[in-house]
Amino acid sequence: MEERDDEKLRISLVGPMHPYRGGIAHFLEKMEEGLLERGHETVPVTFTRQYPELLFPGKTQYVEDAETTADDPERLLDTLNPWTWYRTARHLATLDPDVVVFKYWMSFFAPAFGLIARYLRRRGVRVVTVVDNALPHERRLGDVWLGTFFLRACDGLIVMSDEVEGDLHELGM
């Protein structure tokens, strides 16, 4: 293992980033930019497939303009392929990060994120999640169970609103 400056952290970010479009991807890219500006080392990891294409009829889940100011993320995680969940978890663990930060907004991602978080924590890696939605606005069967499966696997939760904090309390966190 290489020696590192105690004040500078190695932070892995997991979630949608370039080439994916949308506010969540933009948020993670800006978060990475801010961390880099403060001298931290970042390792961004994103999806090979975020959603099945059938969920995007007539439009794309990718940005039209391929330009980004963030580092190119490693595209490892396929939300529909559990083998990539293990591969991503192993890869993140080998990076020896100080912390892995997930971006969470819907229970669809909970199985993959939950498995990865548990794998990392068993290896002594801290896991923190920025939570946009702890519970969906229109709940479906399994949303509560899936959400708690992932969120309970985290060392820390960062909320973006009082409403989300209330939802976490409702879930017993």
Where are these regions (language model features)?
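Nucleotide-activated donor-dependent transferases that construct or modify glycoconjugates
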Residues: E7-R21, V100-V101
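A short, glycine/small-residue-rich beta-strand->loop->alpha-helix junction that serves as a flexible
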Residues: G15-E29, W105-A110, E138
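N-terminal strand-loop element at the rim of the active site
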Residues: G15-R21, E32-T94, V164
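An aromatic- and histidine-rich active-site surface loop
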Residues: P82-T88, V101-R123
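Helix N-cap/beta->alpha junction signal
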Residues: Y104, N133, S161-D162
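Nucleotide-sugar donor phosphate/pyrophosphate-binding loop at the beta->alpha transition
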Residues: R126-V128, N133-A153
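A short, active-site helix/loop in glycosyltransferases that binds the activated sugar's phosphate group
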Residues: C154-M173
